[in-house]
């Protein structure tokens, strides 16, 4: 799997976004091992988080359950006290600091948020840039974490880290696309467990499936975010 993903990324003409009005950020897509049944209890109130979301239409209750097993990626639940995107699902990541590359930033944020120190030799490649409504261009960096990494999330930023099996990305009900009156572009939804992951994280995960796992080069940067993620 490692070489397949590496080769698929290497053979892809990556879409880079250059927009001086947006800030640059990077996220770490970390591939690891996982065991069936190691899901943890979500510390965020699902009922509160689901308020106003159309979960019933997707026959989901918002709980991240039964997602582990086999090759997996790391997914974080952001702390509820954060000033932006509080309690949302996200990949480890953040702003690219002056003098850093996207790879530098992804490795640093992974270390700061999840307590994992990986080297540049673990980089399998980059996915396409994704421009967000909140003023960022996100560069996803795919990393090979290998076996059983010890996760030590920083509680002021991350309240939970899940190992989500890659099989979740290839479910029969994934991906989902819906329309919203605020935009002509389709909103992408990626079902994981009993929850829905939206762009930008959802777009990154969809390209991880399409390009990384299946060798499919379809773009995802025009897929829309839900309105609650625009700020």
Regions found by a protein language model. Give the residues of each.
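N-terminal leader/linker segments that precede catalytic domains of diphosphate-processing enzymes
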Residues: 1-90, 95-112, 116-149, 191-231
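NUDIX/MutT-family hydrolases
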Residues: 153-192
